């Protein structure tokens, strides 16, 4: 009787070890996936909503194939503007490949937020300082081109403490 109990305990431990090993392998494969990295260029003149943003594929092995970027105006404090998703404009790929980013490549794009907020922004110039934005990238999963993956960036806010002001990652 004691041997069968010991054998059952051994089988349970073996099953748990196998499950932990499979979970570790799945986590390792998941961590190798490419994810887009976003940044903004300096705001030199004009509206903060006319800034050019940059997306980069920092993954050394896999491309971001068929990349589509959407800009999300998450919220503007003290306003009635609802969260809104808009497709990015003026996507310019560095290598001339209009379909995606190879490892180490980057592209630039703009977000048409002014169409949401309206013209002129001069009616409330602080609206950009109260805004929070993020980006949503959609691309093909490497090695499984028929499946798509989406990835949300961290939130950005207009940082006026740096000169010139720019959209930076929210602390």
Where do the protein language model's features map onto the residues?
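Short glycine/proline/serine/threonine-rich loop/turn segments at secondary-structure transition edges
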Residues: 117-132
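Short acidic, flexible loop segments centered on an aromatic residue
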Residues: 60-85
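Low-complexity, acidic Ser/Thr/Pro/Gly-rich terminal tails and inter-domain linkers that flank the onset
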Residues: 25-51, 163-169
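Intrinsically disordered, low-complexity Pro/Gly/Ser/Thr-rich segments with frequent PxxP/GP/PP motifs
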Residues: 79-121
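Enriched for extracellular/lumenal, surface-exposed ectodomains of secreted and cell-surface proteins
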Residues: 132-145
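Acidic, serine/threonine- and proline-rich intrinsically disordered appendage/tail regions
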Residues: 142-171
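Hydrophobic membrane-insertion alpha-helices, especially the h-region
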Residues: 11-29
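Short beta-strand elements of extracellular/lumenal beta-sandwich folds
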Residues: 46-62
């Amino acid at each position: 009787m004691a041997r069968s109990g010991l054998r059952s305990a051994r089988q349970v431990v073996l099953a748990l070890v196998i499950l932990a090993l499979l979970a570790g392998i799945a986590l390792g494969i998941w961590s190798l996936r490419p994810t887009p990295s976003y940044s903004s260029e300096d705001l030199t003149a004009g509206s903060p909503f006319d800034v050019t943003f940059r997306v980069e594929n920092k993954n050394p092995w896999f491309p971001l194939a068929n990349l589509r970027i959407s800009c999300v105006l998450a919220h503007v404090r003290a306003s009635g503007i609802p969260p809104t998703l808009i497709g990015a404009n003026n996507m310019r790929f560095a290598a001339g490949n209009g379909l995606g980013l190879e490892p180490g490549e980057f592209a630039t794009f703009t977000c048409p937020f002014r169409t949401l907020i309206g013209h002129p922004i001069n009616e409330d110039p602080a609206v950009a300082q109260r805004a929070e934005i993020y980006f949503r990238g959609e691309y093909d999963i490497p090695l499984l081109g028929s499946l798509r993956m989406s990835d949300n960036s961290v939130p950005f806010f207009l940082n006026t403490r740096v000169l010139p002001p720019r959209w930076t990652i929210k602390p």
